[in-house]
Amino acid sequence: MKVVVKTYSKDKVKLLFAFLIFGFSVHSQRIFDLARSGTVDQMQVHLQSYPEQLNQLSENGLSPFLLASYHGNNGVAKLLMEKGANLSHCYDEGSVIHALIYKNNLELLELLVNQGINLNDTCQFAQLGYPIHFAMALKRYEVIALLIKGNVDLNVKDQQGRDINQLISIYNDPKIDELFH
């Protein structure tokens, strides 16, 4: 039996590795592009081929679910939820709830509230406070109402130790006051 050993030049080996790395990078980047602006069908097809990318973080530390939510791509975000996306990851910019409050994405926030997500998330507390504090600071009235309806803890104190009533006084906003009383 004759064994044939094929050898490759260093340039061919480098080219092969570059192709493998670039190919992985392209597929990896694709999930983030689809999260931002792809369709549900496109994401479904992608996840069938690359299910391990469901909770992969981008080079900026963001998940496909967070990107879809932030960009208002709610159909894709819902698909990612159905597939088991991690909804409790603490990002440098805060939690998923903080992103939804910031973008005023009531549709997804209501879905998460109904599914029992932790409304008293302390992710990035020093920077953003509890979600209820963040919503109050941004004057997201509908979000505040949704959080109250979802039984958010109203006894939590902000980063400076102020309770909800003190914050209501500080904000001096009749709409916020009305939501709590």
Residue locations for each model-derived region?
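Hydrophobic h-region of N-terminal signal peptides that target proteins for export
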Residues: 19-27
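Ankyrin repeat domain, specifically the short helix-to-loop turn at the C-terminus of the second helix
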Residues: 47-52, 78-86, 110-119, 145-153, ...
